[in-house]
Amino acid sequence: MDSLANRISRKIDAIHAQGLNAYYFTDIIVLPRKLVEIYKDEICDNNGNIDISRPKTQEIHRIMLKEVFERFPTLDGLIIRVGETYLHNIPYHIGNGPIKKNEKKTSSITYRSDGGEAIHRDLMNLLRDEVCVKLNKKIFYRTWDFGYFHTVPEYYLNVTEYVPTHPNLFICVKHVRGDYHRMHKFNPTLGIGKHKQVVEVQCQREYEGKGAYPNYIADGVLNGFEELRNDVEPYCLNQLKTNPIFAGIWTWSRGGGWVGPYITNELWCELNTYVLAQWAKDTHLTEGEICKEFARNKGMDGINAEKFCQLALLSADAIVRGRASLIDNINVWWTRDQFISGSDELDFVGFIRRGNVERLLAEKKESIAIWKRMRDIAYSLEGTEKEILKYIRSSTDYGFILYSIFEQGFLIMMKGAEGDLTGVYDIRTLKKAFRNYDKLWKDYETLKNKNSECATLYKPYSFNSRFAPSYCDREKGLKCSVDKYRMIAFER
């Protein structure tokens, strides 16, 4: 324990040496297992969960907060998460989220609620008193959870209106209503209430490649994603920046997700982070100006910087069409980390019954056409380091092949589902799609074998959180879904 504490102290010193403030992240509720055993009757409910509303639990947290800053007096503040409490690598601790999942909303509540408003209020007030007021340190309270604090304005206000503002108290809110998916709306809890807000942005999205291929989200965050531009304002940060409670952004520059793909080059994550960070420093700058500056910093001249930024912008168009949809409601969880799900996550019967088959298939083809344009740009680029240029090209190839696999897999599952409903299968189309699909997987593996800088590859299986540490469910996923129709296509 002393060794870890000393490492943290050195890290805080290193952060300060760079002219930055040091804010450490912690989950609530997590307590030493031995302490819980001693005080179980005073801090746990009838189900054995630690109850933050109990006086002894709050007393323990007040003592803990005081001791943290006594041990690390130069620590500038804490980032508090209450929505996900994971205990995977801390065997001597125990914990749970503070909001009881079985709580029911009262009849006086007219909005979606998990009943946790009072708990959030009490916890925020405790943190405010112990850290912001008594110690003059900062608290960043994240609204992210599995309830409705981070998505429902009425819930948000019913918590925050009962917590006095303080110069050291910030509320952190994801820019999207929910997790970091395309097609999710801009967060309606941004820009409301009295408390200063810091907007959270993920630069390495686990649902969209984790940097294995171009995925430029900075433009969409700042100016509005294509799918949001007919929404009521604000739908982007440039429409929020003049709000007096907007206090800035913080990026998840890396991280997100549970497994791969694992990247060897941070280029695409770095691009998102750089553009957002420079904009946060000067919100008068445009996304385009900053993107070109990034490219010039990588050694590209004016023409090549323009090309690079065009490639980046096109990636957002390709991804929303290839992985999500502007036409129908597609389950945004069908790919995550290194896994590709299949019919178990996608409602092909619904697509068919809504009459969207041809439009959806055309949309997937449009995604591939955009990826081809991106490849053309990538291979025309000049004027940067050889290593960077090689990664731009191979990562764009990676995206092109992967999304081509998505497209052919989608075609097979769609045509297979049509056959399931009608009893008549389009064998010719299925056979052609399988030939393309099988070749694409070989091309994908060849790309990785010939380009060591490529990220690790996706797998045609489903993600399952119960299957640690691989999280790989081989009984479900793209392979199982298409193989069902492989037998039909080649046995007739």
Where in the sequence are the language-model features?
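Active-site core of glycosidic bond-cleaving carbohydrate-active enzymes
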Residues: 168-257, 263, 365
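Intrinsically disordered terminal tails
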Residues: 478-482
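Tryptophan-rich aromatic "cage" segments
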Residues: 483-491
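C-terminal non-catalytic alpha-helical accessory regions
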Residues: 244-468, 472, 477, 490-492
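Noncatalytic linker/hinge segments flanking ATPase motor cores
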Residues: 15, 22-24, 64-68, 182-186, ...
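Aromatic-lined carbohydrate-binding surfaces of glycoside hydrolases
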Residues: 1-178, 208-210, 253-281, 314-317, ...
